[in-house]
Amino acid sequence: MVKLRWMNGEYMKSMDFDKFYEMAEPYIREVIKKNLDLRKIAAMVKTRIEVFPDIAGHIDFFEELPEYDPQMYVHKKMKSTEETSLKVLKDVLPILEAQEDFSNDALYERLSAYISETGVKTGFVMWPIRTAVSGKQMTPAGATEIMEVLGKEESLERIRKGIELLEK
């Protein structure tokens, strides 16, 4: 059974995107009721699932931010703690509030500039942002890709909630 799932996953990875989307869309619509770009969400999960029912567990956070433990901000490899994550989120919030173009590329470029200015590693900044906007440790995409799909207002609201959670 494990090998069959793996083979199916390989088949899905090689599948033409339009065909994949046509087959995945009903599974995505079961979870996502908001007006989000479902094609972008499908592209995120295409290489990460083995069977279509797996989609729900990968994308549920787009519909609603789950409750999560502030310990999720702690990541040994990224060298992030609750304290450093709080500082990063407080630093990037006004930057993102001022950001007009909320496309993945523009967000990544702006956050990369912040990373260069502060002299920290990319993961040190992106880990807390991704945690705040998704409420998960594992996501089908990075922080800026997720924010592009969520949009500016929802992304900022989730970052504010992350700050509140870390300040408790």
Where are these regions (language model features)?
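Short helix-capping/linker segments at secondary-structure and domain boundaries
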Residues: 13-17, 53-56, 135-142
